[in-house]
A protein has these predicted regions:
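Short alpha-helical donor nucleotide-sugar binding micro-motif in glycosyltransferases
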Residues: 130, 279-280, 285-290
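Short His-centered aromatic/hydrophobic patch
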Residues: 138-144, 162
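Short hydrophobic beta-strand element within catalytic cores of glycosyltransferases
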Residues: 315-318
């Protein structure tokens, strides 16, 4: 009797374990995430006007690009997401040549500014788009291994967009997958970041600066009410602590911090000359009230915010990272991140010397115009069409098992 009971218990245990394994491997048990859209957010982004779609039609002669991203605008408006969307919307100005899709966890199945978006965990839609795509793109390190795997089995080129020092450190020594046979492409956002991986082959490595069109951020003089020293994204790396120190040291000046979409935000209440505002898609409203833009970053590989601010003629005070030096050149004033007195002295000079302030405004605007992105975009289009596209190879789609465990 004991043997029978023990055998039954053993068999039951085997069945339970087997069921769990089957559900894990073949059931749709992946983690889910929904993008929460509050009524206020929906109104701000005019969500009700976003077209819905149901059909994944053939791309015909167009180059179909599939991005796989952990976040996307307008729900997260960080630099990488804005950069990807700017590229996508530009490519979609030529819908006869390019067709861009974005898969991101929880994203509603809608078209946002001509780019069709959907939930990464919508397995049926993902498979349909993947099957018809010609290129795979991503800047999300958390999906890097999955993208390399998909490129390997499908034969589709993988374009890897690199924006941060942390991304480079995370990849480590072994960057390229030799099994991809010339279809693994890497794009760095600056010369300084590219130099951190000088070992990568020139043939499959490019530099494309983040696209910021000064025309999109220019603010008419009559709409400007410059008042604040502004810091965008108040996490530790961007200088959230220094913003608080400056507000304490300069009680006669007004400061504002824009809450960012990633990393812990450093905030402080109780200072009458310091306020915080939510990050927004209406960033020109922020620049219209900005007197000086500060960027006391510990790491900054380029400086999209800097170019946006310069486009409005806003003087810049920044830390001396290689990326900010490359981006701003002589158009910014540089201070050591750890030198509070240096920041205080520089801001006081801008406040007390109007001629100096006006000259810094003029050189900022000149630099923004010098960074006209149109030639850069034309070069990107040609590269995608003439170099990346021909690297497409025959392949296969993921199996049911592979699809189910791919983005857990």
């Amino acid at each position: 009797m004991r043997l029978t009971q023990g055998s039954n218990a053993f068999l039951l245990g085997v069945l339970v374990v087997g069921l769990v394994v089957v559900l894990f491997l073949f059931g749709d048990t992946r983690s889910r995430r929904s993008v929460h859209i509050s009524p206020e957010k929906a109104a701000a982004i005019e969500f009700s006007k976003w077209p819905t779609w149901t059909t994944v039609e053939p791309p015909d002669q167009r180059i179909r690009i599939l991005w796989v991203l952990h976040d996307y605008v307008p729900f997260v408006n960080a630099g990488s997401e804005i950069c990807a969307h700017t590229i996508n919307t530009h490519l979609m100005y030529k819908p006869y040549k390019f067709d861009v899709w974005v898969a991101s966890p929880g994203f509603p199945k809608r078209t946002f500014e001509n780019v069709r978006c959907f939930d990464l965990h919508d397995q049926e839609t993902f498979t349909q788009v993947l099957a018809s795509a010609h290129q795979l793109h991503s800047h999300s390190y958390i999906y890097r291994k999955q993208m390399l795997f998909l490129s390997r089995i499908t034969g589709k080129p993988f374009v890897e967009w690199v924006h941060t020092d942390n991304y480079v450190r995370s990849v480590g020594k072994q960057w390229n997958d030799s099994r991809l046979e010339g279809r693994q492409w890497t794009v760095f956002n600056s010369k300084s970041l590219r130099s951190s991986r000088a070992d990568l082959p020139e043939a499959t490595t490019k530099i494309f600066l983040p696209i910021v069109d000064y025309r999109d951020y220019a603010i008419d003089k009559e709409k400007k009410t410059p008042k604040y020293v502004t810091l965008s994204n108040v996490n530790d790396n961007k200088g959230g602590n220094l913003l608080i120190q400056l507000a304490k040291a300069l009680p006669d000046m007004e400061f504002q911090g824009i809450l960012g979409g990633y990393r812990k935000q450093i905030v402080y209440s109780g200072l009458p000359n310091l306020k915080y505002v939510q990050h927004t898609t209406r960033i020109k409203d922020v620049y219209a009230t900005t007197w000086v833009q500060i960027m006391p970053s510990k790491e900054e590989t380029w400086g999209r915010t800097a170019v946006e601010a310069m486009s409005s003629g806003i003087p810049l005070v920044v830390s001396s990272t290689p990326g900010l030096r490359e981006c701003c050149q002589e158009s910014a004033l540089y201070c050591d991140r750890a030198d509070l007195d240096g920041w205080v002295t520089t801001l006081r000079k801008l406040k007390e010397d109007s001629a100096f302030y006006n000259s810094r405004s003029a050189v900022a605007l000149e630099r923004a115009r010098a960074l006209d992105p149109l030639p850069e975009m034309e070069a990107l289009e040609a590269w995608l069409e003439k170099e990346v596209a021909p690297s497409l190879r025959p392949g296969r789609l993921p199996t049911l098992l592979e699809k189910n465990i791919l983005f857990r």
